[in-house]
């Protein structure tokens, strides 16, 4: 099923526009006003699902329910926070939402250093440069970090970064395992498939540990709780930022185990060591062989939701960087056509 991210009532792109993209049958949505760590009310999830259904589509994925930093840090209050997370997962199941995409990145979610990199065709795209990141002064909070300007005050960020000084990669794995061992059984009982998103970019930033960076890490996740509900989001763009990652092989290995529950299929072009920019979706424009990736997914019997993920800003569109309508719609149609062309059932793309 081809899906499309929608940011709810605040999104300048209405559901009525999205339903006009011929291949799109599902919406990837979330509740954005629930404080991190608080349970998501069933009635709110049902209202979101009903709004999507009124527009002729299904609420296929929730992306995401954020994991509280105290859980990642392994602090004493994590038990209550994990209980709340489990209640949210139960409510997803009660509301009939089959997939939950989430991540375990400390402090920062996906990170870029440029939200409007000018490409040769005069479109703009998201980009990342590790050298540029190193020049960002966090003593002012996140004011200078693109996309994170109002996320943390200087004092709040300092305290959080200080707390992570005692958390190395293995400690973060330990805390993640504790979380999975509590949440995955609840997800399995509730009919919800957990789909962990890889770290983006797939390396440490600002001295913080990042552990979900390659195929071996994703395999390790699936062994912590050996349950079909414990799976991943296969994000081509995130994994491709590291040239050592063999995307088709990762897709085959995890797909054979039935652990790929969601796919983000976007393209990137590596522009140097630990630097990249996002590109149009077709293979020729970046470093992702999209045909090979989708072929690998199809060979394993994957029939889950796929989304075109980020897009460029084209045709003078204004909006949230990476999440305009036009280029993501082009990407959705490209992915749908590619899936059909390699022999996949169009009804499941």
Predicted features along the sequence, with ranges:
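Conserved beta-strand edge residues that scaffold enzyme active sites
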Residues: 32-33, 66, 106-107, 201, ...
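A short glycine/small-residue-enriched secondary-structure motif
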Residues: 20-23, 58-72
């Amino acid at each position: 099923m081809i899906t499309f991210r929608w940011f709810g009532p605040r999104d300048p792109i209405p559901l009525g526009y999205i339903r006009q993209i011929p291949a799109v049958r599902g919406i990837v949505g979330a509740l954005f006003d629930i404080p991190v760590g608080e349970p998501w009310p069933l009635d709110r999830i049902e209202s979101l699902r009903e709004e999507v259904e009124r527009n002729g589509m299904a609420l296929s994925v929730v992306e995401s329910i954020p994991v509280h930093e105290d859980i990642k840090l392994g602090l004493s209050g994590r038990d209550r926070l994990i209980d709340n997370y489990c209640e949210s997962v139960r409510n997803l199941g009660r509301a009939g939402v089959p997939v939950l995409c989430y991540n375990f990145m400390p402090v920062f979610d996906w990170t870029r250093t440029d939200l409007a990199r000018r490409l040769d065709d005069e479109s703009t795209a998201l980009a990342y440069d590790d050298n540029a990141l190193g020049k960002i002064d966090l003593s002012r909070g996140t004011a200078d970090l693109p996309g994170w300007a109002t996320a943390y005050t200087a004092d709040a960020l300092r305290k959080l970064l200080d707390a992570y000084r005692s958390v190395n990669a293995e400690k973060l794995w330990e805390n993640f395992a504790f979380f999975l061992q509590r949440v995955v059984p609840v997800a399995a009982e509730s009919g919800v498939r957990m789909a962990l998103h890889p770290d983006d970019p797939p390396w440490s930033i600002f001295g913080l540990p990042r552990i979900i960076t390659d195929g071996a890490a994703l395999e390790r996740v699936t062994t912590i709780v050996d349950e079909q509900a414990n799976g991943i989001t296969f994000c081509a763009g995130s994994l491709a930022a590291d040239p050592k990652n063999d995307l088709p092989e990762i897709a085959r290995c995890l797909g054979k185990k039935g652990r790929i529950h969601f796919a983000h299929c976007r393209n990137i072009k590596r522009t140097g060591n630990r630097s990249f920019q996002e590109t149009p979706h077709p293979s020729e424009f970046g470093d992702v062989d999209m045909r090979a990736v989708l072929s690998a997914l199809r060979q394993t019997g994957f029939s889950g939701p796929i989304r075109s993920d980020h897009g460029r800003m084209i045709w003078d569109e204004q909006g949230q960087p990476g999440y305009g309508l036009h280029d993501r719609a082009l990407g959705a149609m490209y992915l749908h056509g590619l899936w059909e062309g390699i022999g996949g059932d169009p009804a499941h793309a």
